[in-house]
Amino acid sequence: DAFGLYHFDGGPTYEYADARKGEHPDWGTQVFDLGRSEVRSFLFSNAMFWLEEYHADGLRVDAVSSMLYLDYGRQDGAWMPNIHGGKENLEAIEFFQKLNTAIFAAHPDVLMIAEESTAWPKVTHPVSDGGLGFNFKWNMGWMNDICHYIKLDPYFRQFNHRDITFSLMYAFSENYILPLSHDEVVHMKGSFLGKMPGDNAEKFAGVRAFYTYMLTHPGKKLTIMGTELGQWNEWHYEYSLDWHLLQYEPHRQIHQFFKAANAMYLEQSALWEQDDSWQGFQWLCADDNTANTVAFLRWDRERRPLVVVANFSPIHRKGYQVGLPFPGTWAPVFNTDAEEFGGAGLGDTTPIKSVDIPCHDQEQSMTIDLPPMSVMIYRCTRRAPVRKKKDSEKAGEKKTSGKVKKPEGAKDAGTAAKKTQAIKTVKKKDDQA
């Protein structure tokens, strides 16, 4: 930037001299010349200073994609390819690998987070495996999808159901952070509360439901300050948060909700022990788009599941059937529609026993009371033994090959009838002779 190191001594000092590599035309900023050892040393020293002198817990590297691609934000013919003729910035790749290697060698417990908005492979994989060496990456795809979905009128959400399910197609390819960051609440985009459709009660319900969906979705979490207050105004670095809102009941209630939701997250190890692999997640229902609902399981390392059911419609769904992985008693552990959070107090409050009714590809199920614009979470408090099926039930479930097996008596009668017919035929021929 012009207020920083831009042409520090009157000409390119820290940046590339060639404008095809040294300038971001969309932003009007300069690009560090990462091929020069003195520039790399300067950046390494800055990173270490923040960690060692200011004791920062970690660093987030902004706009990583703009450094990895030589053609980022540039028209054809306005960028310079690498020595192999490609668009990858080989110097930036080497820089990130060396930076992360040096930092983790000195401080193995810090966070190195990449804001990388493309599908660049192995951002959070070890350098030894050809990765960039970060330990976390912002999930920009999830953020864009969810911010598009929450702004929609609930009627139109059924046509955009993939916005809340597609992220599971790649959720475990990197170590992701789900970011509701400052980028989404600036420049007239509206606050998180302001994005929600409906009246005030529906807006607050939407915040509670989508934040809980975020907590139960695989990946670490990041939320912009002020969201926990139900802030109406966008975030701005020149102003403080609107703390005065806590004098109003709806904002005190949403504040209480965030405290309770975060405490629940810490208590339920299934939500964070295995959020980097399919071992910790299992879809129950991902395609009920007409109802705007999804249901899934989260598993901890002891194979103890949570059942999560989300309803992103304003319709109260009584008698909603949900599949279960095994029989038992399932108790609600969190309800975003609780009165203490500003909700209507709908939803289950007592444990539910499973029944032998198949649902969602599971042999067991339960029927729940699913409030409008809410998320319900259940855990098994008492696991029942699996009931052995009777022989008659097994026989009823057997698939036949097209030939029905007859009872023994019927088989004997059929054989006797055939023998009688054969005797009559022989006798008739003898008479004719």
For the regions a protein language model found, what residue spans apply to each?
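Substrate-binding/active-site clefts of carbohydrate-active enzymes
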Residues: D1-E88
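A short, structured beta-strand-centered segment in the mid-to-C-terminal lobe
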Residues: F32-D33, S37-R40, L246-F257
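Intrinsically disordered, polybasic Lys/Arg-rich low-complexity tracts
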Residues: V386-A433
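Catalytic cores of secreted or luminal carbohydrate-active enzymes
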Residues: E249-L271
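Core domains of carbohydrate- and sulfate-ester-processing enzymes
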Residues: A2-K21, L152-L168, G342-G343
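Acidic, Ser/Thr/Pro-rich beta/coil linker or hinge segments at domain junctions
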Residues: T336-P358
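Conserved alpha/beta catalytic core and glycan-binding cleft of carbohydrate-active enzymes
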Residues: H55-D57, Y72-E238, L245, L266-V322, ...
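C-terminal beta-strand-rich structural cap/linker in extracellular carbohydrate-active enzymes
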Residues: T350-K389
